[in-house]
From Swiss-Prot:
One of its GO terms (biological process) is cellular response to hydrogen peroxide. The record marks 104 as: Transition state stabilizer. Bifunctional enzyme with both catalase and broad-spectrum peroxidase activity. Formation of the three residue Trp-Tyr-Met cross-link is important for the catalase, but not the peroxidase activity of the enzyme. The gene is katG2. This is Catalase-peroxidase 2. Residues 1-27 form the signal peptide. Gene3D superfamilies: 1.10.520.10, Peroxidase, domain 2 (1.10.420.10).
Length: 749
């Protein structure tokens, strides 16, 4: 299953050359065999079981936001500034300054973010764990993190590793003369590695992830296994700047960056530091996860010379881009356009470029010996900014307008290190910029009086008497809330963007039916709001969720249970102007097993896509199971298809789906008419009883899912089924409500 990500380009002080790790690592095959090994087609449910809460040593009651808000952030920053220029003998600082190393560390922590599934990014601090801690592109970042340990040790639980890894790079830029636009805390630490689809390759630095048209398979963003973005020497090691530009555009686009942001990031990032390729990669030992226990988490032990300082081997590339590697300047763009560049090789054997003009050979200071000077270098991916016509136009504009470049880089950098954090309401600390940016998916503030319990009861009555069916109300609420992704905290019901482009036109949402439902709900909203004399209002975002809740309460009542589905008002309605249409397009469900919807363009099976959807919603196996069972009997399939509606009382919330699925009175066969559809026949009469998809039948076929389905199919499970369904429903409806904690359901049978 898909989990976290990697996009890629040789960012900052490390650009990685595949040639430097000729025999880096192969996937091992001599381990104990898992069930997945013996039965490769077995549905993998592990995405719904991670992370494991028991792995967290801080305990369930730990409140990171409270801890961070009590932190003296200025003191941390001062300690970081001091650290930048306090060189350690065990890993000497280039030019006496660790700033560029920390920028690279921060970039590589955040730059794994990818738009198609929201995985990757700095949240969680996953650079500490395998595989990221041992990616070739992260070589020697183990030293950067170890340099930070005394500061982490000093401030403890008040600042997470995830926040510290990002803050260090931000402070590094400030300490070297660049003005950032701010920093937000709020990234909580993970305590275990998680499984993420980083690509199909079984060997580091291979690239076998393109489709027949040469495009990266979704949701991947990196072009090579083990790199953050792209091969800095050029695609497949071919030094072609124009071909490199195509790869850069694709991978940075999948990192949520447009062309201008891409140019700003590359040109700004490479204003600092240098690459390291004193010799061949043959001198390097194994990565941290494969190193000896005595190395204590360090990897890439270097047997060349002193193994550090001037003898450092990281990417295989060697040299600095500018004459001021530890001070902000515009020299990167000046050098890029002022020189003609000729191809050469680094001491480590990697392809790079130096000025044709021999007078440039003494421009750049040596990182350790003040008596030595060097020529500036460019990588093939740097030259892409000069020769790609679109990139070149932007880069020249930045060269001619330095202040515009400074602003563009500051904004792109802030976006890079915060893109995976979700809405601005999750930002913590005194350095959060006041400006609201469209990529933060803003929603208006609550500037009115919220509805009370009496209003809620009144509104539910009006909704239920509006002529809208249980199915329509449930489907609309689900379509609105289920866009949420727990990976990057995007989507959800807040904002009511289901009424805006592009969501209102998504096929999964039944656009015509949706328009009818929204029109009715908007009428109820307007009538209520216009009747209030005290400034009280209900948002459409709240009303959509309330409509789904009311329908569920009615459906449970038909089953003999009086329930109240917890509801907390406070959502507001975004405008189209607050919504970046292109940015929201990646949230479109191409499959939603909860609605029995599946677009055949998917490269995964319907059950796999169900697990993926449930994983993004942060659901457990039982929560996924009970939601599917409930949605089926509520007749909530897209297009009103009847697949999996195993009940003769659609619209009644009961456990019929599980009871009938597990009944041995039904024999299932593949449909001879429709691919992917199954038909259930009465074993005695031969009469067709039901039709289903593989998403429906997987709950009887997969042994683990069947165990959960059995729990909901027993005679004494009727009330538990409703209780669990409502709790899971509320979890989805409130997934983006970072201001509240979901309440427990109150059932009175």
């Amino acid at each position: 299953m898909f989990k976290r990500t990697i996009p890629l380009f040789a960012a900052f002080t490390l650009a990685i050359s595949p040639s430097v790790f000729p025999n880096y690592a192969y996937a091992q095959e001599d381990k104990p065999k898992t069930n997945q090994y013996w039965w490769p087609k077995m549905l993998d449910l592990s995405p719904l079981r991670q992370p494991n809460a028991t792995s967290n040593p801080m305990g369930e009651q730990f409140n990171y936001a409270e801890e961070f808000n009590s932190l003296d952030l200025n003191a941390v920053i001062e300690d970081l500034k001091k650290l930048m220029t306090t060189s350690q003998d065990w890993w000497p600082a280039d030019y006496g300054n660790y700033g560029p190393l920390f920028i690279r560390m921060s970039w590589h922590a955040a730059g794994t973010y990818r738009i198609y599934d929201g995985r990757g990014g700095a949240n969680g601090g996953f650079q500490r764990f395998a595989p990221q801690n041992s990616w070739p592109d992260n070589a020697n970042l183990d030293k950067a993190r170890r340099l930070l340990w005394p500061i982490k040790q000093k401030y403890g639980r008040k600042i997470s590793w995830a926040d510290l890894l990002v803050l260090a790079g931000n402070v590094a830029m400030e300490s070297m003369g660049f003005k950032t636009i701010g920093f937000a805390g709020g990234r909580e630490d993970a305590w275990e590695a998680i499984n993420i689809n980083w690509g199909p390759e079984g060997k580091w630095l291979e690239s076998k992830r393109q489709d027949k048209d040469g495009k990266l398979e979704k949701p991947l963003a990196a072009t090579v296994m083990g790199l953050i973005y792209v091969n800095p020497e050029g695609p497949n090691g071919v030094p072609d700047p124009l071909a490199a530009a195509e790869k850069i555009r694709e991978t940075f686009g999948r990192m949520a960056m447009n062309d201008e942001e891409t140019v700003a990031l590359i040109a700004g990032g490479h204003a600092f530091g240098k690459t390291h390729g004193a010799a061949s990669g043959k001198y390097l030992g194994p990565a941290p996860e494969a190193a000896g226990i005595e190395e204590q988490g360090f990897g890439w032990k270097n047997s060349y010379g002193s193994g550090k300082g001037k003898d450092t081997i990281t990417s295989g590339l060697e040299g600095a881009w500018t004459v001021t590697p530890t001070h902000w300047s515009h020299n990167y763009l000046q050098n890029l356009f002022n020189f003609n560049w000729v191809k050469t090789k680094s001491p480590g054997g990697a392809i790079q470029w130096v000025p044709e003009n021999s007078n440039a050979s003494s421009m750049v200071p040596d990182a350790f010996d003040p008596s030595k000077r060097h020529a500036p270098v460019m990588l093939t991916t740097d030259l892409a900014l000069k020769f790609d016509p679109v990139y070149s136009k932007i880069a020249k504009r930045f060269l001619d307008n330095p202040k515009e470049f400074d602003d563009a880089f500051a904004r792109a950098w802030f976006k890079l290190i915060h893109r995976d954090m979700g809405p601005r309401s999750r930002y913590l600390g005194s350095l959060v910029p006041k400006e609201i940016m469209i990529w933060q998916d803003p929603v208006p503030p609550v500037d009115y009086k919220l509805v009370d319990a009496n209003d809620i009861a009144n509104l539910k009555g009006k909704i239920l008497n509006s002529g809208l069916s249980t199915s329509e109300l449930v489907k609309t609420a689900w379509a609105s809330a289920s866009t949420f992704r727990g990976t990057d905290m995007r989507g959800g019901a807040n904002g009511a963007r289901i009424r805006l482009s592009p969501q209102k036109d998504w096929p999964a949402n039944d656009p015509q039916e949706l328009a009818k439902v929204l029109k009715t709900l908007e009428s109820i909203q307007n009538n209520f709001n216009n009747a209030q004399a005290d400034g009280k209002k209900i948002s459409l975002a709240d009303l959509i969720v309330l409509g789904g809740n009311a329908a569920i309460e009615q459906a449970a009542k038909q089953a003999g249970y009086d329930i109240i589905v917890p509801f907390m008002p406070g959502r507001t309605d975004a405008t189209q102007g607050m919504t970046d249409v292109k940015s929201f397009e990646v949230l479109e469900p191409k499959a939603d097993g909860f609605r029995n919807y599946f677009d055949k363009s998917n490269n995964m099976s319907p059950p796999e896509m169900l697990v993926e959807k449930a994983s993004l919603l942060k659901l457990s196996v039982p929560q996924m199971t009970v939601l599917v069972g409930g949605m089926r009997v509520l007749n909530a399939n897209t297009g009103q298809n009847q697949y999996g509606v195993f009940t003769d009382k659609p619209g009644t919330l009961n456990n019929d789906f599980f009871v009938n699925l597990l009944s041995m009175s039904t024999e299932w066969k593949k449909s001879s008419e429709t691919e992917g559809i199954y038909e259930g026949y009465d074993r005695k009469t031969g009469k067709l009883k039901w039709k289903a998809t593989s998403v429906d039948l997987i709950f009887g076929a997969n042994s683990e899912l069947r165990a959960v389905a059995e729990a909901y199919a027993t005679d004494d499970a009727k009330e538990k089924f409703i209780q669990d369904f409502v709790n899971a429903w509320v979890k989805v409806m409130t997934a983006d409500r970072f201001d509240i904690k979901a309440a427990n359901t109150n059932i009175n049978s």
